[in-house]
From Swiss-Prot:
Entry keyword annotation includes rRNA-binding: no
Stated role: Endo-1,5-alpha-L-arabinanase involved in degradation of pectin. Its preferred substrate is linear 1,5-alpha-L-arabinan.
Protein's name in the database: Probable arabinan endo-1,5-alpha-L-arabinosidase C
Residues at the catalytic site: 32 (proton acceptor), 198 (proton donor)
Keywords from the named record: Carbohydrate metabolism, Glycoprotein, Glycosidase, Hydrolase, Polysaccharide degradation, Secreted, Signal, Xylan degradation
InterPro entries on file: GH43_arabinanases, Glyco_hydro_43, Glyco_hydro_43_endo_a_Ara-ase, Glyco_hydro_beta-prop_sf
Gene Ontology process terms (BP): arabinan catabolic process; xylan catabolic process
Residues of this chain annotated as glycosylated in UniProt: 190
Gene Ontology terms: cellular component: extracellular region
Subcellular localization: Secreted
Molecular function in Gene Ontology: arabinan endo-1,5-alpha-L-arabinosidase activity
Main location: secreted
């Protein structure tokens, strides 16, 4: 186990490059967070684990209270990992319902399924599980079907997904519950190392679609943290269509290991990632991170958020 002193010994160069996270009070634990604001002003935070943890708060600052699980009995999908769901992505549909996409898998596996549930309130006990979206992988494809992210491009609902292997993909939906018939399209790939790229999140701003994603080692810092710069970090590419041709600030294609870093380790923040963007009087980048003054285990992860600034058409914190 990495000791407290070892955690403090992480490179002191990891400071002062980025703004510190916004204030968080109450139960601020989070892992691969999904975030949505209810019409009544309350914020709902969803996290990986069991039947998807739900916390709520009257403001982004909190105080946050864990209130239960979205699917306390797990998923109806008959697949390994269906009692320990990952990477929730929540949005409000045109029909007024809230939809949550989740992943069913096990660590290191490419045998994965993306499921979906719906609710009229986002409260624990209100979620109906609809099972699989029809999007799955078994190792014979180039992709891994986890980390779903929904967006509407024009009139078309799409899911972005993927983790490691051949990277990030996009597929059209036939509706909120099922995928369409078209094949997934590869939109980002990391050719370096172990191809560490995941947690795609697509956000529209000022005529562009910004593809946020996490690169680097996501966890295990409490037993063996990576070389400086190889831990989780948040990168971005952009496209004018949202359907491909994503490039970073230097013009490097996201299919050729491109990606401009938006947020990396600094000060007390180590390995930020699993991110999304909430429109809340401006764009709010949210994520989890491991506090450097803690034990760096997943159980110590914290909810982080920063308001995004836009400089020459690119997001900064």
């Amino acid at each position: 186990m990495l000791s407290f002193l070892a955690a403090l010994s992480l490179p002191l160069a990891l400071v002062n490059a980025y703004a510190n996270p916004g204030t968080c009070n109450g139960n601020c634990w989070a892992h691969d967070p999904g975030l949505w604001k209810h019409d009544d002003g309350r914020y709902f935070l969803f996290s990986t684990g069991n039947g998807i943890h739900i916390s709520s708060a009257p403001s982004l600052q909190g105080p946050w209270t864990e209130v239960g699980y979205a699917l306390p009995d797990g998923s109806s999908i008959n697949h390994d990992g269906n009692k320990n769901l990952w990477a929730p992505d929540v949005h409000k549909g045109d029909d007024g319902k809230y939809y949550m996409y989740y992943s069913v898998s096990t660590l290191g596996s490419q045998n994965s399924v993306i499921g979906v549930a719906s609710s009229t309130t986002m409260e624990p006990g209100s979620w109906t599980d609809h099972g699989s979206t029809g999007l799955s992988s078994d190792g014979s494809q180039g992709y891994n079907t986890i980390d779903a992210n929904w967006i509407k491009i024009g009139d078309q609902q799409v899911l972005n997904f993927g983790s490691y292997w051949q990277g990030l993909y996009q597929i059209d939906l036939a509706g909120p519950l099922k995928i369409g018939t078209a094949a997934p399209v590869n939109i980002a790939y990391n050719a370096t190392g172990q191809h560490a790229i995941e947690a795609s999140f697509l956000y529209q701003q000022n005529g562009f679609y910004y593809l946020f994603f996490s690169s680097g080692k996501a966890n295990g810092y409490d037993t063996s943290f990576p070389a400086q710069g190889e831990e989780y970090r948040i990168n971005v590419c952009r496209s004018s269509t949202g359907r491909g041709d994503f490039v970073d600030k230097n013009g490097v294609s996201c299919l050729q290991s491109g990606g401009t870093t938006v947020l990396a380790s600094h000060d007390n923040v180590y390995g930020p990632g699993g991110q999304g963007v909430l429109e809340d009087n401006g764009a709010v980048l949210y994520y989890h991170y491991a506090p450097r003054n803690g034990d760096l285990s997943v159980s110590s992860y914290q909810f982080g958020w920063n308001r995004l600034n836009w400089v020459d058409g690119w997001p900064t914190v």
